[in-house]
């Protein structure tokens, strides 16, 4: 985990929370989080965020390809953090294949608040928002890039998230326009790459790591699912 020296204390605390949460997941034998200081572009020097959420830390869970357990990991990470007493939200940014509603056991449509923002549905004490709440399960999302980005912006800025300790973003698989825009337009504290042991999956995972490095988002770690 590469961090800036200025915020080392903050990331040491975050690393401890990650380790404690990951240790509780079934099938995890051991977890080691190593911190390395490096000089990076400061938040103030980045372009101003288009996506505004009042969260202490925003963590993106990404993968180079689909079918590697990215969404499963994102949901389990959110639940583990919630069980540690943190205020957690999960945003399903996988517009074309939303799976968080089913994994969290939620159905129904979000209601609107008096200020015309959507109220996220809750499960296991976690606030959840997904395009899957707004379209039928059997309806394909046949949208071009601009419509996808508009929907993502709505799920950030048009939702009553409240104050969160952590927002977990389940990104779409790959390294396309949606992933790049989310990385550049939201104040990500870090990212986690999920992969499987196969060479093809690991090659795609490297692309994801390189994408986050280019936009100066720390890669917290790589999770290898079996």
Walk through the language-model features, giving the residues of each.
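Gly/Ala-rich phosphate-binding loop of Rossmann-like dinucleotide-binding domains
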Residues: 23, 78, 82, 183
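Walker A/P-loop phosphate-binding motif and the immediately C-terminal alpha-helix
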Residues: 57-94, 209, 222
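Phosphate-binding P-loop
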Residues: 51-56
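A short amphipathic beta-strand at an alpha->beta junction
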Residues: 23-46
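Phosphate-binding/switch loop-helix module in NTP-utilizing enzymes
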Residues: 135-182, 202
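Conserved catalytic-core segment of NTP-binding enzymes
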Residues: 165-166, 172-226
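A short interface-forming secondary-structure element
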Residues: 1-22, 34
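Phosphate-binding loop that captures ATP/GTP phosphates
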Residues: 81-143, 149, 153
């Amino acid at each position: 985990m590469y961090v800036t020296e200025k915020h080392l204390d903050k990331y040491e605390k975050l690393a401890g929370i990650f380790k404690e949460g990951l240790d509780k997941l079934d099938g995890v034998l051991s977890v080691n989080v190593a911190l390395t200081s490096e000089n990076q572009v400061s938040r103030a020097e980045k372009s101003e965020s288009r996506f505004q959420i009042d969260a202490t830390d925003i963590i993106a869970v990404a993968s180079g390809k689909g079918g590697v357990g990215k969404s499963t990991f994102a949901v389990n990470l959110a639940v583990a953090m919630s069980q540690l007493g943190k205020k957690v939200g999960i945003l399903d940014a996988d517009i074309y294949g939303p799976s968080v509603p089913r994994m969290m056991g939620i159905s129904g449509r979000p209601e609107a608040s008096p200020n015309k923002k959507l109220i996220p549905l809750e499960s296991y004490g976690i606030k959840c928002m997904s395009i899957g709440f707004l379209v039928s399960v059997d309806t394909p999302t046949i949208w071009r890039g601009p419509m996808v980005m508009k929907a993502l912006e709505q799920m950030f800025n048009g939702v009553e998230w409240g104050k969160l300790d952590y927002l977990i973003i389940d990104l779409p698989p790959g390294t396309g326009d949606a992933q790049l825009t989310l990385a550049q337009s939201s104040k990500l504290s870090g990212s986690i790459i999920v992969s499987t042991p196969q060479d093809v999956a690991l090659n795609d995972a490297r692309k994801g790591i390189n994408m986050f490095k280019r936009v100066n988002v720390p890669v917290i770690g790589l999770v290898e699912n079996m």
